[in-house]
């Protein structure tokens, strides 16, 4: 009897150990086993390496985009499947998908060319003990001409694999730093184009997309030979925290280097669909190593630069939900001779956000200047300063000192020995043909006095390259000038660290010219908008390269075109009929007119006249009333004319209903209305102020949703830009109504950008600012894994449903891209706002 009891106990023990090692489907809709998570078709952005089957191991995303693809190593321009249905079962996830996605064939924001191939398929992702099984059923066999092209791919993140080992059956290797020959030539799918255009949206020009020679939209004609072929593959066999083994039961596995035909590619493991295969066309067994004792190391989140002595100071501690330890939170002071504990902080349990639990601790009462660090168990925050001059040097200044000069178009940009880029795009621009293009550009017919291909003169001046794409978009140009104008009006910072010569088209970084750099940059933005308007007789949509290979250029912007006006490499200029953007631009130009007055009076006059003309000629339906109110507000502040005051007063009811969104740009107007003798203006002022507490209550509710003190609802794209924009808008409320609106959200938004944000990567989003910052960014020098000081990246993104991620990788635009029309300029504004508020 005793023997039976011992045997039964042993069986129970073995059973519990085995069950503890099993993958289980969580309430969040993904498979989990200790520190290993396997998501399945929750993300919806495969062209951005977020989709299909995704493997996260101990806080690192190691592989993603497990799905059927039509090429061995596709890039962002290749066809992606359309997801039709996703069903979460007891311990499996079943997904139905199809090719093609007709809505993306030859049309849309970035058109794709789908081959003449139509099929549906089902993917089943199932937890089976200590591994995940992936099986694919097709509704029909793959046609012979596509055999070898269609397969199941899984992409491995290259940034953490360089120099790391892999094993395929009996062959082994090291992931290389760069892609290596030999090349493999294949017949491209482009030779079998489909006809799936639905008639919705403008049609792209296939010949223009494909171009001549290498084309990013042709991904499969020349690729790298696979590094290995076999049935069982192990990545990082030496590292239990990142080791994963994949076995194919239906065909060979092949390991490819996707960087051979796309510089931004990933390593790809794939198995091809075999001839005649339908049910069980793919069957993989994925076995990640599971380290049972692994627990997410607490992350101590603070600003990477530190805090003004008068600033609210909080530390946020991010912990594993299983971590119930109550460890002391210690504030350390670092002096020349010692590091000592100056205070043990009182912690507040904030609760769960995304996948982590959060603690918070306040140390606002610490005002002695010096170097500090926060310690929680074995985890440390970055070293930061507390000082009254913490924002005074090298914090907001790099935006004007480096980033905006580097982004200047139609310029040569020098920095002493260095040339950031040569004089570029002096052959701008030809009138765009009427068809759908790339990056959202879509020329409609009969919107210009110029015919397609005709030279549009006078537009080769001013502007900034938008992000890493080199185009000039109306919202990025006028919007940037607007934010900079708001900064100049609010703070009037003195800075002269660049010499900008618009006549000879040369910018010299770290060479003073006696002019305020902020005003010079406002001028640069206004020049492109005004000159394009004068040339076209209307606003441009933007200027962009005419070919896809030009669009993906990595390197000197001057290499995109030859600078000779009127030939086939010239960029195209677009127009559009978009009342919303036109009215927004009117608001932008009206404000820019104020800052340019006395600096460049001719440009100021043009800005104001264009804004007035747009306001007068653009009808606003119900959906656009508030956009026109914004334009009226800026025009009133510039001119004090009754026509704009009357438009605002006429729409009082709508404004009050939209107070939460409109108060920031109407606050300055309301304060002027309150001083007028006009009864209607005074009544407006009274109603406006009465509605503000409602907006405050709405804001308080949103702020309470996160441990970071700001409205923050993560999504696929990094949220840094949105949070900076929020802080920028909130400043105007704090400045006008300090008795209602607290300044703390301004500081919280700034701290978020400077490092106090979710995830293990604590880097400041502002490149070159702070102890640790984003020094690999999606800018013009991304191919060199480098950065532009003062550029502000998109920031921590969300791997759905709950994993915050910020990779050190230059080719993920949704995490590390720089932009114009916000981003860095909003960040600069926030720093100046904090400086002003705290120094009062």
Which residues fall in each region the model found?
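Bacterial Sec-dependent N-terminal signal peptides
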Residues: 1-21
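Low-complexity, Pro/Ser/Thr- and charge-rich linker/hinge segments at domain boundaries
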Residues: 160-167, 293-312, 381-419
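Polysaccharide-binding surfaces and accessory modules of carbohydrate-active proteins
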Residues: 22-25, 140-238
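Aromatic (Trp/Tyr) and acidic
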Residues: 203-241, 305, 313-377, 390, ...
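Extended, loop-rich substrate-binding clefts of extracytoplasmic carbohydrate-active enzymes
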Residues: 71-141
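Beta-strand-rich N-terminal accessory domains
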Residues: 21-90, 186-223
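Carboxylate/His-rich catalytic cores and anion/metal-binding grooves
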Residues: 477, 515-540
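Beta-strand-rich recognition/accessory modules
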Residues: 214-293, 834
């Amino acid at each position: 009897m005793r023997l039976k009891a011992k045997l039964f106990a042993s069986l129970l023990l073995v059973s519990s150990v085995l069950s503890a090692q099993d993958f289980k489907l969580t309430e969040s809709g993904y498979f989990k086993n200790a520190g290993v998570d396997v998501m399945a078709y929750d993300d919806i952005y495969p062209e951005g390496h977020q989709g299909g089957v995704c493997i996260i191991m101990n806080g690192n995303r190691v592989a993603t985009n497990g799905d059927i693809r039509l090429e061995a190593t596709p890039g962002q321009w290749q066809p992606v499947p359309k997801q039709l249905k996703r069903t979460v079962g007891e311990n499996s996830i079943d997904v139905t998908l199809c090719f093609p996605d007709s809505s993306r064939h030859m049309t849309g924001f970035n058109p794709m060319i789908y081959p003449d191939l139509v099929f549906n398929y089902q993917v089943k992702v199932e937890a089976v003990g200590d591994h995940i099984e992936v099986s694919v059923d097709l509704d029909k066999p793959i046609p012979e001409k596509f055999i070898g092209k269609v397969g199941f791919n899984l992409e491995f993140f290259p940034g953490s694999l360089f120099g790391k080992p892999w094993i395929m059956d009996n062959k082994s290797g090291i992931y290389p730093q760069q892609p290596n020959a030999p090349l493999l030539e294949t017949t491209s799918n482009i030779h079998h184009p489909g006809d799936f255009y639905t008639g919705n949206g403008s049609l792209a020009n296939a010949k223009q997309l494909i171009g001549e020679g290498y084309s990013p939209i042709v991904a499969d004609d020349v690729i790298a030979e696979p590094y290995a072929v076999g049935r069982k593959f192990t990545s990082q066999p030496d590292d239990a925290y990142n080791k994963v083994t994949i076995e194919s039961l239906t065909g060979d596995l092949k390991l490819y280097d996707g960087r051979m035909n796309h510089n931004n590619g990933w390593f790809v493991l794939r198995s091809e669909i075999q001839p005649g295969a339908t049910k069980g066309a793919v069957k993989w067994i994925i076995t990640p190593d599971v380290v049972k004792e692994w627990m997410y190391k607490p992350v101590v989140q603070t600003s990477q630069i530190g805090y003004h002595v008068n600033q609210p100071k909080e530390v946020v501690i991010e912990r594993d939900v299983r971590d119930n330890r109550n460890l002391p939170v210690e504030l350390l002071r670092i002096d020349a001779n010692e590091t000592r504990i100056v205070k043990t902080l009182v912690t507040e349990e904030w609760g769960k956000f995304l996948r982590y639990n959060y603690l918070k601790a306040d140390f606002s009462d610490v005002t002695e200047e010096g170097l500090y660090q926060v310690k929680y168990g074995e985890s440390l925050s970055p070293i930061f300063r507390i000082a009254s001059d913490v924002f005074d040097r090298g914090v907001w200044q790099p935006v004007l000192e480096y980033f905006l000069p580097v982004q200047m178009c139609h310029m040569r940009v020098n920095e002493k020995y260095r040339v950031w880029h040569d004089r570029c795009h002096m052959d701008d621009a030809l009138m765009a043909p009427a068809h759908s293009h790339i990056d959202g550009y879509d020329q409609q017919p009969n919107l210009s006095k110029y015919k397609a291909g005709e030279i549009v003169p006078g537009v080769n001046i001013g502007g900034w390259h938008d992000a890493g794409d080199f185009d000039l978009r109306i919202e990025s140009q006028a919007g940037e000038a607007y934010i900079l104008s708001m900064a100049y009006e609010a703070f009037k910072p003195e800075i002269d660290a660049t010499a900008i010569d618009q006549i000879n088209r040369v910018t010299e970084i770290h060479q003073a010219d006696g002019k305020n750099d902020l005003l010079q940059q406002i001028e640069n933005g206004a020049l492109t908008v005004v000159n394009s308007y004068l040339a076209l007789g209307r606003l441009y949509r933007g200027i962009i390269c005419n070919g896809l290979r030009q669009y993906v250029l990595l390197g000197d912007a001057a290499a995109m075109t030859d600078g000779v006006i009127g030939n086939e490499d010239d960029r195209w200029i677009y127009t559009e009929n978009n009342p919303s953007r036109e009215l927004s631009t009117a608001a932008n130009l009206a404000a820019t007119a104020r800052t340019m007055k006395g600096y460049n009076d001719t440009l100021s006059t043009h800005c104001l006249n264009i804004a007035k003309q747009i306001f007068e000629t653009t009808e606003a339906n119900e959906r656009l009333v508030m956009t026109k109110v914004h334009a009226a507000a800026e025009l009133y502040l510039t001119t004090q004319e009754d026509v704009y005051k009357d438009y605002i007063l006429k729409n009082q009811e709508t404004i009050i209903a939209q107070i939460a969104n409109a108060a920031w740009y109407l606050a300055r107007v309301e304060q002027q209305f309150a001083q007028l003798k006009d009864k209607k203006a005074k009544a407006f002022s009274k109603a406006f102020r009465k509605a503000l507490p409602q907006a405050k209550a709405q804001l308080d509710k949103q702020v309470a949703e996160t441990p970071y003190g700001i409205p923050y609802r993560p999504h696929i794209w990094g949220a840094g830009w949105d949070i900076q924009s929020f802080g920028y808008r909130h400043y105007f409320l704090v400045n006008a109504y300090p008795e209602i609106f607290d300044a703390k959200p301004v500081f919280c938004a700034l701290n978020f950008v400077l490092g106090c944000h979710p995830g293990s990567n604590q880097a400041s989003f502002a490149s070159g600012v702070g102890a640790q910052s984003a020094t690999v960014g999606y800018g013009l020098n991304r191919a060199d894994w480098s950065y532009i000081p003062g550029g502000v990246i998109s920031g921590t993104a969300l791997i759905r449903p709950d994993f915050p991620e910020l990779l050190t990788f230059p080719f993920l635009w949704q995490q590390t891209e720089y932009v114009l029309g916000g981003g860095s300029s909003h960040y600069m504004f926030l720093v100046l706002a904090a400086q002003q508020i705290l120094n009062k």
